[in-house]
């Protein structure tokens, strides 16, 4: 288990980014910490949160609480995602493509953390645009939010699932 991973109940949490930030005031700079935390159950539920505080543990705790509040459920096709999708947030853009079993998670740091927490085992990704960890995490979540299962698509189109799958 990595240094910045915690298994709490059935939720796995991982700190993706920690930064020291400064607010300039009359008397100088006021330092604090900003933490991006990803939380997931490894079975299709994942969330991300941002916490800010004067101390590191407090920033991580706030980020974890925020992530738990903003969890989403994603449809999985076995160990991968149902279809290709592009997630965008700010200047960050993440391309997510389904992969055949045994491929593994082909992704960079921040995107990998989100996908592993969600329980995706086989996927191909490409990060485009911003390489800011917070933007990449939120772009990945935006992409995962767009995913629809074959059943959902069939219901929306008013067609049988077999016709959608081909």
From Swiss-Prot:
Gene this protein is translated from: rpsE
HAMAP family, per database record: Ribosomal_uS5_B (MF_01307_B)
GO biological process, one term: translation
Domain S5 DRBM: 11-74
NCBIfam families: rpsE_bact
This protein's name: Small ribosomal subunit protein uS5
Assembly behavior: Part of the 30S ribosomal subunit. Contacts proteins S4 and S8.
InterPro entries: Ribosomal_Su5_D2-typ_SF, Ribosomal_uS5, Ribosomal_uS5_bac-type, Ribosomal_uS5_C, Ribosomal_uS5_N, Ribosomal_uS5_N_CS, Ribsml_uS5_D2-typ_fold_subgr
Pfam families, per database record: Ribosomal_S5, Ribosomal_S5_C
Gene3D superfamilies, per database record: 3.30.160.20, 3.30.230.10
Gene Ontology CC: one annotated term: small ribosomal subunit
Function summary: With S4 and S12 plays an important role in translational accuracy.
Residues forming coiled coils: none
Family per record: Belongs to the universal ribosomal protein uS5 family.
Free-text comment about domains: The N-terminal domain interacts with the head of the 30S subunit; the C-terminal domain interacts with the body and contacts protein S4. The interaction surface between S4 and S5 is involved in control of translational fidelity.
Taxonomic source organism: Symbiobacterium thermophilum (strain DSM 24528 / JCM 14929 / IAM 14863 / T)
Family matches, as PANTHER family: MITOCHONDRIAL RIBOSOMAL PROTEIN S5
Molecular function terms, GO-annotated: rRNA binding; structural constituent of ribosome
């Amino acid at each position: 288990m990595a240094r910045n991973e915690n298994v709490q109940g059935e939720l796995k949490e991982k700190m993706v980014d920690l930064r020291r930030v400064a607010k300039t005031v009359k008397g100088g700079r006021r330092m604090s910490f900003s933490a991006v935390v990803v939380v997931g159950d490894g079975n299709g539920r994942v969330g991300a949160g941002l916490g800010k505080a004067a101390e590191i543990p407090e920033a991580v705790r706030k980020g974890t609480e925020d992530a738990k509040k903003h969890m989403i459920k994603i449809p999985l096709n076995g160990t991968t995602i149902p279809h290709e999708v592009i997630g965008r947030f700010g200047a960050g853009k993440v391309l997510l493509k389904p992969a055949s079993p045994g491929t593994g998670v082909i992704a960079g740091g921040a995107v990998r953390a989100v996908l592993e927490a969600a329980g995706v085992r086989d996927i191909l990704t490409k990060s485009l645009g911003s390489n800011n960890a917070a933007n990449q995490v939120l772009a990945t979540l935006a992409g995962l939010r767009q995913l629809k299962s074959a059943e959902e698509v069939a219901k929306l189109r008013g067609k049988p699932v077999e016709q959608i799958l081909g």
